[in-house]
């Protein structure tokens, strides 16, 4: 490598050349070019200055950098050296690193170069730092110039402890530890660690170090509550436990009770903690109420106080005038008022527990809503309202009867006339005629029956609370203080008494109605036999007509007399003659409620009425027979013989004659005339207006000619008047013909 001497020699040679003849001189450009070639050929190793007018070898650069560091007092920033030497910072930094690696007398730190002579300055810094620490006891490193390299100071340079960014003296830490000990000894209650730490003035790390040092020395008179890292961590001194135990023990011995709120404040809200203070045996003797612990002796005193108050107290003076002596002394006491003399901090729940204990231990005693009272008050109160209960029972029985009648007596809506030819079908003459006039839908398709919400039995009646309260207030047998309580207590008993009274009244009514029921069943049975006889008679009459008229008449017979007979049999089965008033749904529900031996035959009976088969009448007779057997209704309905039918025919003729004589409606008069003439001819039947034209056609053989002609004329006139209701002339002609027909038939 080129030495500095070689450079100097080269410089001398160049200078001599420059001093020679001008022809041999080198320009500045030539000089730079020569140097560049020398550097490129690695003949020389130099570094240019920033302005390019000066160059220096790297070895000489190291010397100049060292000189600059020593000249600066042993410490020089690299930036300052670069400015002083007018060389790029990169060359300065690279050369400084070479110096540090090859020379132990120099150190590079944080872009600053330090010389060995700088140690004298470090000693001065140590003295300065010790002085600061001694005066301020602690200060943050950021307040010091970090260029002092305080981290490299040895423990012999100054007496202190570095904790993060803070330096503490040993004397300061010892003093803070003594302060912590004094605070821990002085505390008498549970205190948060954060409060103690703030009072001592240490960081969390130094605080716990001091705390652990005291613990190791046995100088911590207490325990920690919770985790050290938790903000809720607290210190519980032993003195606090002693004071709590003394306080609770003395309070319990003096008062014989302990408030749970006080125990919770003292940290004794658990049974285990309380046992540690009083002892497990003593805690077992305590009576646990809602907000207080008390001794069994104090509990007995409370019970005896209330019992004595209940025995000695008289009722409110407003009632003494009205209440009998045995009620005045029967016993009533308010828990709160009775226990005021004991001056106990009881809440409502505690008073209720005491009242319940009294009610459970003392015979014939009740407790409710803060009052203790004797059962005799309830007994006398219930007796005092017997009159009101009896009156209400009669009212309820009447309501039940009315509702039963409504449910069973709901009439189906009026039947609309089926067609214009079905006229005059309200009265048909005779037993069968009247029944036939009801039409084929009498027992059938009604609408949905309404369901009533009114009670239908004694099990649903009850006494309202407002009503009971009014009765008791009127009787003046219950003090106003416990009136609400007595109403709640007696509500069920009063309702039971009312239902019992209703049952007794209903039982009496059943006894009274029993005889009437037998008579009613007998009448219904006679009605069934009479209807079945009429049915057989009319059925025999329909056999004289050719089909399809005969078949139509038999179907009509089923829809009229057959339906009436079925309803009568069902009425006999249930014992109430009101089935004809029921709608179809109600009737079906009534059938379903019957016993199976009765239900099935009656169900088949009503089913046969809806049949349109040729053997519908035979099915009807079979069903009637099944309904009348002993296992069902015991009606014993039988088909009548020819003689019986003749007797029924005579009765039918007589009834038709009476109706015809009193009838004035043309259409009905015509129908009755036709039925009467057939009955007189030994062919009794029942029909509606739509059969009149066909029946008249069958009368030509046995009816006089003039009568037959009148029948035809009247039939045409009736149809004309129905179709033309405003034709007064036709009505007048019809009226004349009807009168002639009526006279001719009844003569």
Swiss-Prot record:
Name of the featured protein: E3 UFM1-protein ligase 1 homolog
Which key words are in the record? Transferase, Ubl conjugation pathway
Task: Point out the gene that encodes the protein.
Answer: ufl-1
Q: Per the UniProt record, which EC number(s) apply here? A: 2.3.2.-
Tell me the domain of life: Eukaryota
Spell out the GO cellular component terms annotated for this protein, sorted alphabetically and separated by semicolons.
Answer: endoplasmic reticulum membrane
Task: Region Disordered: list its residue ranges.
Answer: 403-468
Mark out the compositionally biased spans (Basic residues).
Answer: 429-438
Role according to the record: E3 UFM1-protein ligase that mediates ufmylation of target proteins.
What's any GO biological process attached to this entry? reticulophagy
Q: Which GO terms describe its molecular function?
A: UFM1 ligase activity; UFM1 transferase activity
Composition-biased stretches (Gly residues): 439-449
The record's family statement is: Belongs to the UFL1 family.
What InterPro entries does the entry give? Answer: Ufl1, Ufl1-like_C, Ufl1_dom, Ufl1_N
Which spans does this entry mark as compositional bias, Polar residues?
A: 450-465
């Amino acid at each position: 490598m080129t030495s500095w001497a070689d450079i100097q020699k080269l410089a001398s040679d160049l200078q001599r050349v420059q001093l020679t003849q001008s022809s041999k001189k080198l320009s500045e450009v030539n000089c730079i070019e020569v140097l560049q070639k020398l550097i490129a050929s690695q003949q020389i190793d130099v570094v240019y200055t920033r302005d390019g007018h000066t160059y220096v070898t790297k070895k000489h650069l190291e010397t100049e950098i060292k000189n600059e560091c020593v000249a600066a007092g042993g410490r020089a920033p690299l930036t300052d050296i670069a400015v002083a030497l007018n060389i790029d910072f990169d060359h300065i930094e690279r050369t400084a690193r070479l110096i540090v690696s090859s020379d132990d007398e120099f150190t590079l730190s944080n872009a600053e170069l330090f010389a060995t002579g700088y140690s004298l300055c470090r000693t001065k810094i140590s003295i300065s730092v010790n002085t600061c620490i001694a005066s301020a006891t602690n200060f943050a490193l950021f307040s010091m110039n970090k260029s002092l390299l305080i981290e490299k100071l040895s423990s012999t340079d100054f007496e202190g402890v570095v904790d993060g960014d803070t330096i503490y003296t040993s004397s300061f830490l010892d003093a803070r530890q003594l302060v912590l000990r004094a605070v821990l000894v002085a505390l008498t209650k549970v205190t948060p660690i954060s409060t103690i730490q703030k009072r001592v003035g240490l960081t969390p790390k130094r605080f716990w170090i001091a705390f652990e040092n005291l613990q190791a020395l046995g100088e911590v008179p207490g325990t920690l509550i919770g985790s050290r890292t938790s903000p809720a961590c607290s210190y519980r001194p032993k003195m606090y436990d002693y004071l709590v135990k003394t306080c609770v023990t003395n309070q319990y011995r003096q008062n014989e009770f302990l408030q749970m709120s006080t125990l919770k404040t003292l940290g004794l809200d658990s049974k285990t903690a309380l046992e540690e203070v009083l002892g497990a045996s003593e805690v077992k003797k305590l009576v646990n109420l809602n907000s207080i612990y008390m001794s069994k002796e104090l509990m007995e005193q409370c019970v005896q106080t209330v019992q004595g108050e209940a025995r000695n107290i008289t009722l409110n003076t407003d009632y003494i005038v009205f209440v009998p002596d045995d009620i005045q002394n029967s016993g009533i006491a308010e828990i709160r008022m009775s226990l005021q003399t004991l001056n106990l901090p009881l809440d409502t729940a505690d008073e209720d527990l005491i009242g319940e204990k009294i009610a459970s231990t003392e015979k014939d005693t009740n407790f409710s809503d803060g009052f203790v009272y004797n059962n005799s008050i309830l007994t006398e109160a219930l007796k005092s309202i017997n009159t009101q209960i009896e009156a209400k029972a009669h009212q309820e029985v009447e309501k039940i009867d009315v509702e039963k009648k409504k449910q069973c007596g709901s009439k189906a809506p009026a039947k609309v006339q089926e067609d214009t030819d079905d006229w005059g079908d309200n009265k048909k003459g005779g037993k069968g005629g009247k029944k036939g006039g009801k039409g084929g839908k009498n027992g059938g398709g009604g609408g949905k029956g309404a369901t009533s919400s009114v009670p239908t039995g004694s099990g649903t009646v009850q006494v309202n609370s407002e009503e009971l309260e009014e009765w008791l207030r009127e009787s003046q047998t219950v003090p106003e203080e416990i009136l609400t309580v007595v109403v709640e207590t007696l509500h069920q008993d009063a309702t039971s008494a009312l239902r019992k009274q209703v049952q007794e009244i209903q039982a009496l009514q059943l006894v009274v109605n029993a005889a009437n029921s037998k008579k009613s069943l007998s009448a219904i049975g006679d009605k069934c036999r009479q209807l079945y006889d009429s049915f057989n008679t009319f059925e025999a009459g329909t056999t004289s007509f050719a089909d399809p008229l005969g078949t139509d008449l038999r179907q009509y017979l089923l829809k009229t007399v057959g339906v009436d007979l079925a309803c009568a049999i069902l009425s006999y089965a249930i014992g109430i003659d009101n089935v004809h008033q029921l709608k179809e749904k109600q009737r079906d529900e009534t059938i379903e409620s019957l016993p199976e031996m009765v239900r099935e035959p009656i169900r088949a009976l009503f089913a046969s009425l809806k049949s349109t088969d040729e053997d519908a009448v035979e099915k009807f007779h079979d069903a009637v027979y099944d309904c009348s057997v002993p296992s069902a209704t015991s009606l014993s309905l039988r088909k009548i013989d020819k003689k019986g039918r003749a007797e029924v025919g005579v009765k039918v003729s007589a009834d038709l004659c009476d109706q015809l004589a009193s009838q004035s409606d043309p259409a009905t008069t015509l129908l009755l005339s036709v039925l009467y003439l057939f009955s007189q001819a030994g062919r009794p039947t029942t029909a509606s207006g739509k059969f009149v034209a066909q029946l008249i056609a069958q009368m030509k053989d046995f009816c006089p000619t003039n009568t037959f002609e009148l029948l035809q004329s009247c039939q045409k006139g009736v149809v004309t008047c129905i179709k033309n209701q405003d034709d007064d002339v036709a009505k007048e002609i019809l009226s004349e013909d009807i009168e002639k027909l009526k006279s001719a038939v009844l003569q």
